[in-house]
């Protein structure tokens, strides 16, 4: 598979990687350093605005890859902390469906024309997954991408990834973001298999951190993959 609009014309194959930080770069090149922006003192408001922009750009790269190269046509916005996810999905693929799983008290805020909203009020992750699996809003016999990019901390990793992985009979993807160290963030994907380069700063993923000469945002992110399940076999899709 080739990443679309993520690394530019020198993009190489995007592959599943091991949990170790020694995994090879998808492009096979680690020498290029990419300065992103000048260092400057910023106000808290300006910094938050910049982080929002970078988060939206990360989601855009993920969505472009999933639509163009992975053939995903179903997206679940699981409490993403920035607006515009449904619109970004439809820009990439006009026929794609989007379901918002809304954190407590945000269903009205996240509601978008043409996108279903599954309210999280009073529901735990397991209950929400059951509702998602039985509501008919998502066909888990086909590939689906879950964007769960509200950054988690080392002490509060996401729950329900095992159950989500089991639901994805037709294969799928999980996007996560975290303020935790790389090793902790990558372990949170289990049993999903992170794609190259594992996790990297949200500002420049899918470039690995060591290829970029910038201090970054302090938020790492990545994309994990679940294989197609069926008849005792597991196939990548």
Task: Enumerate the language-model features and the residues they cover.
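Conserved beta-strand signature within the Rossmann-like core of class I S-adenosyl-L-methionine
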Residues: 143-148, 160, 164-179
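A short, conserved alpha-helix within the catalytic core of class I
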Residues: 123-131, 139-141, 153-163
